[in-house]
């Protein structure tokens, strides 16, 4: 019986240490690395970086603002507000005009918008756990969209190693506020890269 208690104690201690290390920010006052376009190189060879392009569209900024508002609702564990903002994001995505982009960019943007719209619709109809599952994929879509449209704002790609094997999202603030765990683990994550 004593051996079982010691084993359970050791397992609990190991789990606590893993959780603590995994969620540690790791930021030692080092500035975030500037993000160039490496992660989109295979699809965006004609782009030098994610800075604002000639194809900048005000509606792309509206989509970003809706995304950030949705992120903030998830950070605040506000299911009702997230539903409302998911619906608002659906409308912004549907009104996005791709006509000023090259044929290749139009094709990519149409795919991104279709996928992002589906996830925003799920968010507008779901409980918070399901909203967060769809926000993970929505975040990838929005990041891919920014690689094409550019942005006027400085953005931070943040990363939580704990949620679903590791998950990234975009933020306007360098300070990490985790939309996947909300108040449960608000500060879990780190700035992975700086955009623009």
Identify the residue ranges that each predicted region occupies.
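C-terminal motif of bacterial Sec signal peptides marking the signal peptidase cleavage site
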Residues: 19-22
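Post-signal peptide N-terminal segment of mature Sec-exported envelope proteins
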Residues: 32-55
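Mature extracytoplasmic or organellar-lumen-exposed domains after removal of signal/transit peptides
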Residues: 54-196
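Bacterial N-terminal signal peptides that target proteins for export
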Residues: 2-12
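Bacterial signal peptide processing site
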Residues: 24-27
